[in-house]
UniProtKB/Swiss-Prot annotation:
The keyword Metal-binding does not apply. The gene is gvpI2. This is Gas vesicle protein I2. Belongs to the gas vesicle GvpI family. Keywords: Gas vesicle, Plasmid. Residues 52-63, 82-93 have a biased composition (Polar residues). Proteins GvpF to GvpM might be involved in nucleating gas vesicle formation. A minor component of the gas vesicle. Gas vesicles are hollow, gas filled proteinaceous nanostructures found in several microbial planktonic microorganisms. They allow positioning of halobacteria at the optimal depth for growth in the poorly aerated, shallow brine pools of their habitat. It is found in: Gas vesicle. Residues 11-22, 69-81 have a biased composition (Low complexity). Induction: In PHH4 (a deletion of the p-vac locus) transcribed in all growth phases, maximal expression in mid-stationary phase. An unstable 6kb transcript able to cover gvpD-gvpE-gvpF-gvpG-gvpH-gvpI-gvpJ-gvpK-gvpL-gvpM is detected, as well as smaller transcripts. Gas vesicles appear earlier when grown in static culture, possibly due to O(2)-limitation. GvpF to GvpM interact with each other in vitro, and may form multi-subunit complex(es). Interacts with GvpC and GvpO. It comes from the Archaea. The keyword Ligase does not apply.
Length: 113
């Protein structure tokens, strides 16, 4: 490989890493925005369901949920909050960002408003 080819290859690799980081950051921003939008929708649905009076026609008397009622978005976030993804990717050359799931996603979404 000639010095010119090595230089071009190095520039291409840097460009690819920069594009990957920008794509990753854009995806994180979209994830946080979507989480906030879903939290607002949950709050609207909760308010609406609290104000509506159930009638015997619409309520299923045999319906029973075995899950505890979740009244806040933080409780919803904590319900399924585990990850099997390693914190640092094995063959990555760039620094890994903190994983966003569960309460970490909820806390990030609520502080970025």
């Amino acid at each position: 490989m000639t010095p010119t080819n090595r230089h071009t290859h190095g520039q291409n690799a840097q460009h690819a890493r920069r594009n990957a980081q920008q794509s990753r950051d854009a995806a994180r921003r979209k994830l946080i925005a979507q989480h906030a939008a879903l939290a607002e929708q949950r709050a609207r649905n909760r308010r609406r369901s609290d104000t509506e009076q159930p009638t015997s026609d619409t309520t299923n008397p045999a319906a029973h949920s075995t899950l505890p009622a979740q009244r806040t978005n933080a409780q919803n976030a904590a319900r399924n909050a585990h990850s099997t993804v390693p914190e640092q990717p094995t063959h990555a050359t760039t620094a890994a960002r903190a994983r966003l799931y569960g309460l970490r996603l909820h806390n990030t979404a609520t502080t970025d408003k």
